[in-house]
Amino acid sequence: MSFYESVFIIRQDVSLNDIDKIVDDFTKIIKDNDGTIIKKEYWGLRTLAYKIGNNKKGHYYFLGIDITSNIKEELERKMKLNESIIRFLTIKVDSISSEPSPILKNQSTENTPVIDVTINN
């Protein structure tokens, strides 16, 4: 198993309940294949650097996971097929910090409500 960090952007018109369903689907794939979710963060609705399709904003979600490369490929395949996800990136890392990400720290200092942060060690 290897550590990966995955960030995906969900269309701006998708509700928070639907975002939870998308993340739950990914969580199920990971857990069904003996993977572990170490960190899960919702970064909020953020303005995109450039317009993607009709989207000027997107819901950003971060997953820090311990999985095999086969699970990574399956997750990326599901992300590609999901029309609500407009962009995603998954990279292999040496370790996953138990600290909140810098983006989440900035949100906290700006008094923006944090909806979901989960850190499992």
Curated annotation (Swiss-Prot):
Q: Which InterPro entries match?
A: Ribosomal_bS6, Ribosomal_bS6_sf, Ribosomal_S6_plastid/chlpt, Transl_elong_EF1B/ribsomal_bS6
List, in alphabetical order, the Gene Ontology terms for molecular function in this entry: small ribosomal subunit rRNA binding; structural constituent of ribosome
The UniProt keyword set, sorted, is: Ribonucleoprotein, Ribosomal protein, RNA-binding, rRNA-binding
**Which GO cellular component does the record give, naming just one?**
cytosolic small ribosomal subunit
GO BP term, pick one: translation
The UniProt entry, under HAMAP family, shows:
Ribosomal_bS6 (MF_00360)
Q: Which family does it belong to?
A: Belongs to the bacterial ribosomal protein bS6 family.
Q: What is this protein called?
A: Small ribosomal subunit protein bS6
Species in which this protein is naturally found: Rickettsia typhi (strain ATCC VR-144 / Wilmington)
- What is this organism's lineage? Bacteria, Pseudomonadati, Pseudomonadota, Alphaproteobacteria, Rickettsiales
* Annotated gene: rpsF
